[in-house]
């Protein structure tokens, strides 16, 4: 559709901008099993390449040094990956194994204890594997509410308004605020959701990279081995 529009309008040159030049693409192997690989923007389309060449790349470290991104600090803790198994796509761990690892390694208790220590943080966004786990945290952490996909839209809207206004300190979320949630004043994220996806890790850390006069840096708390697995996003 885009190609037809550009051709009909007589547009010869198109400039594309993206914050995520790398994406996971799932393909079928010769053995009949699906596999996933990271592909670049210029080569990832299954319908043919639209963008032909990358003409400029702004490295994340460059963005931090230029103060377009907030400075980041990391705290990463030991995590045993023994319970984790890949799902059928090979792109992510299975939901059941993610929940098993979360439970067996008592990540919920670790999150609660860490939040108690973070008395100097104004707002904390927490990623957990399931709705039940998110709701459980709301009973253990003061000023904490859960956000998930099938909650009433008005309730979700009001919860996020509370969070952004500072009336609510913590939000435990399940795969809904990891991408595209814009709250520049957010100064801390906690990941309690194991992941095999570099894209998810990059996007979630991105929630705390916005600059704001009221914060000096964004704090990333990692309970699931994401930093050892993927590294700091500034180094990607």
Where do the language-model regions lie?
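Short, high-confidence coil segments that cap the C-terminus of an alpha-helix
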Residues: 11, 120-122, 167-168
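Conserved segment of the helicase C-terminal RecA-like domain
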Residues: 194-203, 207-235
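A short beta-strand-to-loop transition that corresponds to the Sensor-1 phosphate-sensing loop
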Residues: 17-21, 128-130, 174-176, 224
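Short glycine-/polar-rich loops that comprise or flank the Walker A/P-loop
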Residues: 10-13, 51-53, 69-72, 143, ...
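Conserved helicase ATPase core of P-loop NTP-dependent helicases/translocases
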Residues: 125-127, 133-137, 142-179
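Post-DEXD/H (motif II) to motif III coupling segment of the RecA-like Helicase ATP-binding lobe
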Residues: 1-74
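SF2 helicase motor core recognition
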Residues: 67, 170-190, 197-199, 204-213
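Conserved interdomain linker/interface between the two RecA-like ATPase lobes of SF2 helicase motors
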Residues: 52-125
